[in-house]
Amino acid sequence: MAGVNDAIRDSVLFTTADSIISWSRRSALWPETFGIACCAIEMISAGCARYDLDRFGVVFRPSPRQSDVMIIAGTVTRKFAPVVRRLYDQMPEPRWVIAMGTCAISGGVYNTYAVVQGSETFVPVDVHVPGCPPRPEALMHGFLLLQEKIKKSRALTGTPLGRVIAS
């Protein structure tokens, strides 16, 4: 009888629905492909063969309705902020935001009336990737931190976690 119990133990997986849902969400992150400033060049580099974000399950999508991650890569002006918010609202739930670069995080060197001083004023930001511009490795690290955040969140209860800063 011990052989039957060993066979069952080796073929049955015990887990929770939360862990299955968070595994599927973090394994297939689809960021939206739009860039605002020079950080977008580094974002494009991160998707190329040298860095290959596809191996982490990150596949860039052309439409907000097909994506679940928004990368705000660059300076956001007050005139452009409602457009970014509309794109965010068009994304299906659950959705996450990565603020990439100093300009997206705090307005950067542009301390003027026309530039939004931080993306958190119009969308909730989950991960901050600092730098001017941040290297593709920093964006990769930001995606790994986002995956860890998704792993720790409760999918069924919708418990959100705080923001994460990539170093």
From Swiss-Prot:
It is a peripheral membrane protein. It holds the Pfam family Oxidored_q6. It is found in: Cell inner membrane. Its EC number is 7.1.1.-. SUPFAM superfamilies: HydA/Nqo6-like. Disulfide bonds: none annotated. Keywords: 4Fe-4S, Cell inner membrane, Cell membrane, Iron, Iron-sulfur, Membrane, Metal-binding, NAD, Plasmid, Quinone, Translocase, Transport, Ubiquinone. One of its GO terms (molecular function) is 4 iron, 4 sulfur cluster binding. Its cofactor is [4Fe-4S] cluster. Its main location: membrane. GO terms for biological process: aerobic respiration; electron transport coupled proton transport. It is an enzyme of class 7 (translocase). It catalyses: a quinone + NADH + 5 H(+)(in) = a quinol + NAD(+) + 4 H(+)(out). InterPro entries: NADH_UbQ_OxRdtase-like_20kDa, NADH_UQ_OxRdtase_20Kd_su. [4Fe-4S] cluster binds at C38, C39, C103, C132. Transmembrane segments: none annotated. GO terms for cellular component: plasma membrane; respiratory chain complex I. Binds 1 [4Fe-4S] cluster. NDH-1 is composed of 14 different subunits. Subunits NuoB, C, D, E, F, and G constitute the peripheral sector of the complex. NCBIfam families: nuoB_fam, PRK06411.1. Belongs to the complex I 20 kDa subunit family. NDH-1 shuttles electrons from NADH, via FMN and iron-sulfur (Fe-S) centers, to quinones in the respiratory chain. The immediate electron acceptor for the enzyme in this species is believed to be ubiquinone. Couples the redox reaction to proton translocation (for every two electrons transferred, four hydrogen ions are translocated across the cytoplasmic membrane), and thus conserves the redox energy in a proton gradient. This is NADH-quinone oxidoreductase subunit B 2. It comes from Rhizobium meliloti (strain 1021).
